[in-house]
């Protein structure tokens, strides 16, 4: 993968990465405070100050508005699946925090987020164990 300087990214590319972070957290059962916090950390990592970012969350949609001083840019992202995977939530939170505080390369941060996204869609427990747990819980 080529080295990409995050300062040369368009505002649209930056907003997509911020929304990717929020979507990953929302689809894996994170709370709204954590989603907003980690999205703002990702924005700060990309050079966007928190004062210039407005984030609004609903059950299935993330809305972000960024003011770059000249114009405002708005993007929406739909979240179609909702589940619980606290490992993915923890990994995504750590990834955004490490990217910000350790000044991680952009490519490594994006690759890490995509890896977390791929691993979060895999089944954690075997199907027989889920069925057994449901049976025990409902008896």
What residue ranges belong to the model's regions?
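Short coil/turn segments at secondary-structure boundaries
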Residues: 36, 109, 127-129
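Cytosol-/stroma-facing membrane-proximal "stalk/adaptor" domains immediately downstream
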Residues: 98, 107-110
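Soluble N-terminal domains of membrane-associated systems
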Residues: 1-103
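Juxtamembrane loop-helix boundary motifs flanking transmembrane segments in multi-pass membrane proteins
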Residues: 105-108, 133
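Core alpha-helical transmembrane segments of integral membrane proteins
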Residues: 119-139
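Cytosolic juxtamembrane amphipathic/interface segments immediately preceding
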Residues: 110-120
């Amino acid at each position: 993968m080529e080295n990409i300087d995050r300062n040369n990214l368009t505002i649209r590319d930056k907003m997509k990465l911020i929304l990717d972070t929020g979507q990953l957290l929302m689809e894996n059962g994170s709370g709204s405070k954590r989603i907003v916090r980690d999205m703002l950390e990702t924005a700060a990592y990309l050079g966007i100050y928190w004062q210039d970012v407005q984030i609004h969350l609903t059950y299935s949609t993330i809305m972000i508005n960024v003011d770059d001083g000249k114009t405002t840019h708005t993007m929406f992202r739909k979240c179609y699946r909702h589940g619980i995977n606290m490992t993915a939530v923890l990994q995504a939170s750590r990834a955004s925090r490490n990217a910000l505080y350790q000044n991680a390369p952009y490519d490594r941060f994006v690759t890490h987020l995509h890896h977390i996204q791929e691993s979060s869609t895999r089944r954690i427990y075997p199907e027989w164990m889920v069925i057994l747990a449901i049976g025990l819980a409902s008896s």
